[in-house]
Amino acid sequence: MLRRYVTALVGRPKTVIAVVMAITLTLGFFITRLRLMLDIDSQIPPGHPLVIVGQRVEKLFGGKYITVVGFYPASGTVYTPQILAKVKRVTEALAALPGIKEGSVLSLMSPRVKDVHSSEEALEITPLAGKVPETDAEMAAFRERVKANAFLTSLMVSDDGRATSILADFDDFEKAGGAKNLYGRIENIVAPERENGLEILPAGAVTILYWLLVYTRRVAALFVLALAMIGYLHYRAFRTLQGMIVPLVTAIMGVIWALGLMGLIGAPMDPWNIMTPILLLAIGAGHSVQILKRFYEEYARVKEARPDLTSVEHNRHAVIEATVKVGLVMLAAGTIASLSFGSLAAFGLPSIKNFGLCTAFGILAALTVEMTFIPAIRVLMSPPSPRQTEREKREEYFDPILEKLASIVRNGRERPIFWVFVCLIVVALVGVRRLDTNNSLGAQFFEANVPVHGFRMADSRLAGTRVIQVLIEGNAPDTIKNPDVLRRIDELGTFIAKQPLPIGKVVSIVDLLKQMSRVMDNGGPGTLPDSVQGVAQYLLLYSMGGDEKDLNRLVDHDFQNAVITVYLKTDDFLAMKALTVAASQEAERLFAGLPVTARVGGGVTNAIALNETMVRGKTINLIQISILVVVITSLLLRSLAGGLLVLLPLATSALVNLGLMGWAGIPLSMGTAAISAMAVGIGADYAVYFIFRVREEFQRCGDLRLATATALTTSGKAIAYVASAVAGGYLCLTFSGFKVHVLLGVLVALTMVTSSAATVAFLPSVILRVTPRFLKRQ
């Protein structure tokens, strides 16, 4: 059936090329619809309890796009007229930005930050700073007011006065400019205020999203670099321009098909699936190399067997034979690769799901192009000249290694190789036990990256920028005014503050009530009212002097819901998880029997939810991939043993890579989660091609050792070049500067080394030990 298809195809090559080009141009048009989108929600697992709580908190109190602008003088304190004037100007400019959440801009110079104090007549609530203090006396009085209102001001100024910050939140991120423009607008505001001896650094979600956008855009240039790298390696493989250009053209067509479909269906590009073009380029070019390598073999064989035919007829027969013999294997390998990437949907994360599904379609698209365009274009091209065929056979740097392996196989000395790989697997298993998950800031950026500096400064000199929140939900309006509920909120806040973690500040509505009590009692201990009426009276007093909107970040309008916000000075995953667990357990104990529900979530707990989802998704993904490989190859080879043999080098490669990550301390994160699927999706080609070639040669010569040695010097050579091309292409990502891309580039390159080595070294040693019967079947 396949032979009839290929024969018909090469009979109408121009028609086939025209159809393929028409589809390519049509889908290429839709690439213009592609949009680069950076959405925080696409990186967190929907439906996870911690995420649900976080989304509820964001809806009630905001905080999703909170930004901290820190002022860090190199010497002295921030209590100078010059620095405070800068803080005031930046505060006013941020408050005027479109999309800013009303009343969310807080600083020492913000009218929203109040001074709660008493006078001879009554409790008074006035802005902390009506104007910038200019004289020494004014500055001293201002510092006293800041100290007296530390329940709030400690969020915005360090105890030693060496740093201060402005907090801002946005309720309409797109109106504010989105990731592309908002950071630039903030920079335009703070840049004129910078001077020698004063650092002004933005930090927060806006900063992270902007730099993700910067690093993501660099991938376009890296794609061109990867294209050049893969082209060079293909030229080394064939020593002809045809051998270099044809695989690249077909691979680029596959990329166009995949990106065009993404544009057609409206799938966004993000920092994770932006790497899809490089991946498809590598896989598509790899398949093409397998066909073309086999074409040169078949051309030499047909030319020797049928000297009576013309060179054009030799070319046509070679195209048919190469496509028929490689086609079925390519379809199997491509199907495995496509399903392997499609299985990434098991992670339940929108970004990884999009990456997997888009790559799966791209592989099928590349497969379609390779099974149509390559035979059609190859049959129209001039037959290889004697010089071209001779250059294609020229020894390259992989040949001595493969010849050595073939010699070891022929002489029956492969046992040490078998035991070396067994030992490597054992070491890898130990490393896997050390593997951890981490989706913190440090897992995505290098310490030297620009956005990290702002976070680290805020951590070391201020209250921090990362938060964990406890949502207190009442059964009815005014529930939060219940004195018992307020006491439990206070107790929970005290419990959290005492945890052995770098906690910068714990903020809740009780801080304001205790400060008012402290002022009214002339410096008393600050106690909470013991009745609903007492609480209501405090709040009435505040509304008379202040503004009820000042409370919007602490309680909702009906006093039915409140939030405790914990500011952290670390992004250590284990510390955050320990705090989340402890706070959840204590909240459950404290609020038992009260008409409220207390749940922990929001902020950095999204990273905890992401880690838990990834561990579960990774396990499911590995099981799915293993089953897919065994089922498909077992059906194709009509042997369960054959399916297990194909799985062996893939499992070895995935295991070694995960083990290395464990030993090297590289965590499982958003950037490295897809490594196993990529190891199988790309590496499946190697094992399938090799086993089919061993079977073909075994049926021809009847000697398993000779057949395996021949497969090593033929398919093994193609495998080596494909692996080197994929590795070279992905190593280009190391120039990105983005830790996720750098790690992925290195790990994929390592995957290519381990999967190809396991195929040409470990797999032959296993085949020769078990002598599977399916190799003898036609």
Identify the meaning behind each predicted range:
Residues 331-373, 630-634, 656-667, 695-696, ...:
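Hydrophobic, glycine/alanine-rich multi-pass transmembrane helices and their short helix-loop junctions
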Residues 1-38, 326, 376, 390-440:
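Signature of alpha-helical transmembrane segments and their immediate interfacial
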Residues 1-231:
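Membrane-proximal extracytoplasmic
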Residues 11, 213-269, 346-350, 620-665, ...:
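Interfacial segments of transmembrane alpha-helices in multi-pass membrane proteins
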